[in-house]
Amino acid sequence: LAKQSEFNNVGKIWINTYFSGSAVLISDNYVLSAAHNVIESDTRIDTINNNGQIFYANVPINHRVVKSDSLFVELAGKRHPVEKVIVHPKYLSDIDQGEYDIVLLKLKENIKEIDPANLSYSTDEINSNVTGVGYGATGIANKEEVSMEMEKIAGQNVVDSIGGLKENNLNIYLYCDFDSPNDQTTNKIGSPEPRKLEYLCAAGDSGGGLFREISKGNWELIGICKGNEFNHKQFQKTIHYGQIMRWTRIAPFQEWISKNCM
């Protein structure tokens, strides 16, 4: 599925030699991704309470946007240098909250050999059959182990819910849960029936695209991967099944995207 030519516009973000996440080409020289892919931070040790479970973790502090001369976008195996980084201002206003997690990257050179994604500004995404594409970790749904191969993967799901904060009077998130074919109690929102290639986004998928096929071979981009809302108690019971992933919706950001790159 990921090897379909329609998804050649999904690539990788590199901070020098460090793989940071996924991205989607939306014009000859602009790429959309998740803002957190271009943020550097220092860290300190702290405790985190996740649904009553206490963890020790490296908590990021002193956030800053990566300089453009350290950023590269890899498409079809070729790395392209970044000229300009445009992070959504509401993300920068409170990076710790992580809302409005979207960034535009202007490339130094035009990309002619890859068709950019078609952006969808429609607001009828609920219950849509969708395909997520990115370079995230892979694994088996009922096993804890995952591997980071940095290979393009794709999976299917359904937009189960729309919510979150608002931009231009539109909620900014699309939600999909990871349904099990054998245990409907893992269903959190929407239909309990999984798609044939039902999947959950993972580390590395951030910034990748959520696509909807509107006619045979004609895909449109409706979301950018933000990540999943990890529920530790659910993980203890059903591993990856029952987790919920979030995608930053394209529609609310039409004005911002158009103003900055179109």
What do the PLM-derived regions correspond to, one by one?
Residues 2-16, 130-132:
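A short, Trp-centered hydrophobic/proline-enriched beta-strand micro-motif
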Residues 3-9, 24-39, 44-65, 149-161, ...:
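C-terminal subregion of chymotrypsin/trypsin-like serine protease catalytic domains
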Residues 10-28, 96-97:
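A conserved glycine-rich beta-strand in the N-terminal activation segment of trypsin-fold
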Residues 14, 93-96, 147-148, 198-203:
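Short Gly/Pro-enriched turn/cap motifs at secondary-structure boundaries
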Residues 16-18, 77-80, 217:
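Glycine-centered tight beta-turn/hairpin loop motif at sheet-sheet or coil-to-beta transitions
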Residues 29-41, 81, 86, 91-123, ...:
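Conserved active-site neighborhood of the chymotrypsin/trypsin-like protease fold
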Residues 93-97, 143-147, 165-170, 214-220, ...:
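Short, solvent-exposed loop/turn segments that connect beta-strands within catalytic domains
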Residues 99-102, 108-198:
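Chymotrypsin/trypsin-fold serine protease catalytic domain
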